């Protein structure tokens, strides 16, 4: 279901990338309170219109992301910036379902684009919650971005965001990181 509406979906974005995001992949959003989650529900920031317009809504490609990487690249930096934040868990869905959300004219509403974070450093890092891992290269190859596939009018934006929110809901209860991501380092 990759399409011309999302040209970046058609090629991997870095040599070290595991490849383009496939329809069968699981896509996860890490939920930090109060940013993405508050009062047992998603906040408006969870599916930020601004980030979606800029193609900067960060998500994880589950099959290409470890628990270590989630803590190191996503959770710990957020908690360090603001110790009042709290890890809630993970909301996840299948990529093809994200790509299937359409506008009132039948056009795709969202793109899911491979966007690995590649850096080099072989230090050992404490990643929190009693987990220690050896992120040898500290690469976060399972990082991806979501974006709107096109310019949408305000009503279509609201409808698309609402549909995306419903898709990521899993009985209104987030999963734990340990239940979703593999342990391997």
Language-model-detected regions and their locations in the chain:
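Short aromatic-glycine-(Arg/Gly/Cys) micro-motifs in beta-strand/loop hairpins
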Residues: 34-50
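Conserved NAD+-utilizing ADP-ribose enzyme module
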Residues: 1-24, 47-55, 63-185
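Compositionally biased, non-globular sequence tracts
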Residues: 28-29
């Amino acid at each position: 279901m990759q399409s011309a509406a999302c040209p970046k979906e058609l090629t991997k974005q870095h040599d070290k990338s595991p490849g383009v995001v496939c329809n069968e992949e699981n896509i996860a959003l890490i939920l930090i309170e109060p940013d993405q989650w508050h009062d047992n529900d998603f906040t408006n920031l969870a599916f930020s219109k601004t980030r979606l317009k800029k193609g900067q809504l960060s998500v994880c490609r589950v099959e290409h992301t470890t628990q270590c990487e989630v803590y190191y690249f996503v959770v710990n930096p957020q908690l360090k910036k603001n110790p009042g934040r709290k890890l809630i868990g993970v909301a996840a869905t299948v990529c093809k379902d994200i790509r299937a959300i359409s506008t009132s004219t039948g056009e795709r509403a969202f793109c899911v684009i491979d966007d690995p974070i590649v850096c080099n450093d072989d230090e050992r890092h404490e990643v929190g919650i009693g987990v220690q891992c050896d992120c040898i290269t500290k690469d976060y190859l399972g990082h991806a971005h979501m974006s709107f596939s096109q310019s949408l009018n305000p009503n279509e934006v609201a409808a698309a965001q609402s549909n995306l929110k419903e898709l990521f809901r899993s009985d209104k209860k987030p999963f734990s990181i340990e239940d979703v991501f593999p342990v391997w380092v």
